[in-house]
């Protein structure tokens, strides 16, 4: 049985001897949300002091309080269950698809994964520590916004490959993707994504992987 009764969408590729394309969607309320850190210097924090996982949006944010010169950082997370990929399989491509309902700023948004064999849904702020990030990082330049249209990231196969190459990775495990801003000067940088809890899961984040 699939967790939450929601199977992935499978679109098998034809020809070329490859595996296939599979689209996974966030399928539970606690599987997307944000880690936030307040009153920080301009450098991106290594830890966070707030976790939110039940809102209808997940913000990726870097904002400065001009009166005090301190920053708020919020990074979004999206956890995808039941990834049907064997340990060490070659990832041909991988894309994060999200609906960004609103945003501001033009700095590049960063995409990483949680470097874990079978990441659990976040339950404490330490689950957002940057020490858990993959070494692979992909930049997404100035993502567009729209109330209902999905935006597709650049290829993040290096992020997914690093996770499935782990020695204890197994088919059926979960992958969590995170997005954050670590630059942008004093200009507010924001992308606000729809979450599983928005409008009865009408626009959950998706992870499209081809093997």
Where is each model-derived feature located?
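Extracellular/periplasmic catalytic domains that process cell-envelope and extracellular macromolecules
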Residues: 71-72, 90, 103-105, 168-171, ...
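Extracytoplasmic/secreted proteins, especially bacterial periplasmic and envelope-associated proteins
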Residues: 75, 79, 93, 155-159
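Extended extracellular/luminal ectodomain segments enriched in beta-structured repeat modules
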Residues: 72-75, 85-95
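Short, intrinsically disordered N-terminal pre-domain segments
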Residues: 1-14
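Flexible, small-residue-rich N-terminal segments that precede or flank a structured functional core
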Residues: 6, 16-82, 112-121, 128-134, ...
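Beta-strand-rich interaction/scaffold domains
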Residues: 100-173
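Aromatic sugar-binding interfaces of carbohydrate-active proteins
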Residues: 173-185, 191
